Amino acid sequence: MHKKSSTLIRKREISDVTKESKVVLKSDQQWREQLSEQEYHVCREQGTEPPFSGKLLHNKDSGEYACTCCYAPLFSSVNKYDSGCGWPSFDAPINETAVLYLDDFSHGMKRVEIRCARCDSHLGHVFPDGPKTTGERFCVNSVSLIFNKIETNE
């Protein structure tokens, strides 16, 4: 289970992440060449895709959700649920070091932004209104994720 602080989420430092995985650093130009306009806007400029528009919103296949920018594993289908918010929602990341948490005071609100711990890509936000399993709702832009389906032999 994810450890919580007295506010909402325990903050992680970049140094916590580098012990377990290599941080991906690219120039702005390299990101622009790699990503589509929408991917760049959401992942590198902290944009948001329109609600109910994401390609992964209704995905029910078993597998792993990875970062669009660096392919780091971020979420498991086991933790995905329909929150009704218009974006893919998860009750936890794939592991404790997969995402970074940052205070976000934009748009006159206080929220907690989530980013890929490996490449600092904007993913979305985490809220304290999730299911009973963790109490957290990781609200993630579809465009910031790549889905890797697990093939079953049925």
From Swiss-Prot:
Amino acids binding Zn(2+): C67, C70, C116, C119
Keywords assigned: Metal-binding, Oxidoreductase, Zinc
Domain MsrB: residue ranges: 28-150
Entry's cofactor comment: Binds 1 zinc ion per subunit. The zinc ion is important for the structural integrity of the protein.
Reactions that this protein is recorded to catalyse: L-methionyl-[protein] + [thioredoxin]-disulfide + H2O = L-methionyl-(R)-S-oxide-[protein] + [thioredoxin]-dithiol
GO molecular function: peptide-methionine (R)-S-oxide reductase activity; zinc ion binding
Cofactor(s) needed by this chain: Zn(2+)
EC number: 1.8.4.12
Record keyword Ligase present: no
GO biological process per UniProt: protein repair; response to oxidative stress
InterPro entries, per database record: Met_Sox_Rdtase_MsrB (IPR028427), Met_Sox_Rdtase_MsrB_dom (IPR002579), Mss4-like_sf (IPR011057)
Pfam families tied to this protein: SelR (PF01641)
Major enzyme class: oxidoreductase
One of the record's GO cellular component terms: cytoplasm
Protein family membership: Belongs to the MsrB Met sulfoxide reductase family.
NCBIfam families documented for this protein: peptide-methionine (R)-S-oxide reductase MsrB (TIGR00357)
PANTHER family from the UniProt entry: METHIONINE SULFOXIDE REDUCTASE, METHIONINE-R-SULFOXIDE REDUCTASE B1
Name the UniProt record assigns to this protein: Peptide methionine sulfoxide reductase MsrB
Gene: msrB
